[in-house]
C-alpha cells in the first residue's frame, strides 16, 4: 500500500513520528501514540459499519481511484494514517460535508469535521410574538 506523500506533508510529525513511519507502523504501535479516548475506541475494535468503511478505503487505495469523495454516515471512526490524502463526505444529519484528510487530522474523529449544529440567528420578533409586543405601535 504505497502512498504518494507531497513535499509539505513530509515535514509533518505526529508525536515525533513522520507520516512515512506512521504508515509503516503496526496498528498496535500506532494506538499507543493516540490520546486516551481514541486509544480506548480503537482497542475495543471496529463496529461493522467502521469495518466496511476501512475495507472500502483499503480497496480504493489498492485500486488508486480516489477521485470521488467517499460518502459515509460513520462519524465515530478515528482518522488513521492510511486515510491521509483521501476525500470524505461525512453526513451531518442534513447533508454530506466534504473535506480532504490532511496529516494534521490524524487521531481525530471523522465527525469532528462535519459539524451537525448551525448557529441560529433570530430576527426581530413579529407583532404579537411576545406579550410586550402587543403594546407596540403597528408597523407600516
From Swiss-Prot:
One GO-annotated biological process of the protein: translation
Spans through the membrane: none
Keywords: Ribonucleoprotein, Ribosomal protein, RNA-binding, rRNA-binding
Matching NCBIfam families: PRK04038.1, uS19_arch
Taxonomy, superkingdom: Archaea
Keyword Ribosomal protein among UniProt keywords: yes
Native species: Metallosphaera sedula (strain ATCC 51363 / DSM 5348 / JCM 9185 / NBRC 15509 / TH2)
Function summary: Protein S19 forms a complex with S13 that binds strongly to the 16S ribosomal RNA.
UniProt protein name: Small ribosomal subunit protein uS19
Family label: Belongs to the universal ribosomal protein uS19 family.
Pfam family, one: Ribosomal_S19
Gene designation per UniProt: rps19
One Gene Ontology cellular component annotation held by this UniProt entry: cytosolic small ribosomal subunit
GO molecular function, one term: rRNA binding
